[in-house]
Regions:
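N-terminal glycine-rich anion-binding loops that anchor highly charged ligand groups
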Residues: 30-37
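Short glycine-/aliphatic-rich beta-strand segments at the starts of folded cytosolic domains
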Residues: 1-11, 40-44
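C-terminal structural segments of small proteins and small subunits
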Residues: 52-81
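Short amphipathic alpha-helix segments
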Residues: 12-28
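Solvent-exposed beta-strand sheet faces enriched in polar/charged residues
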Residues: 6, 36, 45, 77-79
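Short, conserved charged micro-motifs
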Residues: 13-16, 49-56
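Conserved functional loop/turn residues at catalytic and ligand-binding sites
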Residues: 29, 45, 69
Length: 81
């Protein structure tokens, strides 16, 4: 079962990567970009067949390793099969 984990900096946490991307976009002539937040996407292919258990497992993985929960939030999405 495919599970997607989106990890993003929490609101109010400095995001230097997002700021650098925003600056680069402006340098390239793109206008109207008010803010950029940069995170990561992790796609897991789990052997689990029960969507609820797959979600629970991915959430535990995110809390323990995939996200630094002090400064990052995460969202888990189980792919419909």
């Amino acid at each position: 079962m495919k599970v997607r984990v989106d990890v993003m900096p929490k609101e109010g946490v400095l995001d230097p990567q997002g700021k650098a991307i925003g600056h680069a976009l402006g340098t390239l002539g793109f206008t109207g970009v008010n803010d950029v937040r940069a995170g990561k996407v992790i796609v897991l292919d789990l052997e689990e067949t029960d969507p609820a258990r797959a979600r629970s497992t991915a959430e535990e993985m995110a809390r323990k390793l995939l996200a630094n929960t002090v400064i990052e939030g995460f969202r888990v999405e189980v792919a419909a099969e």
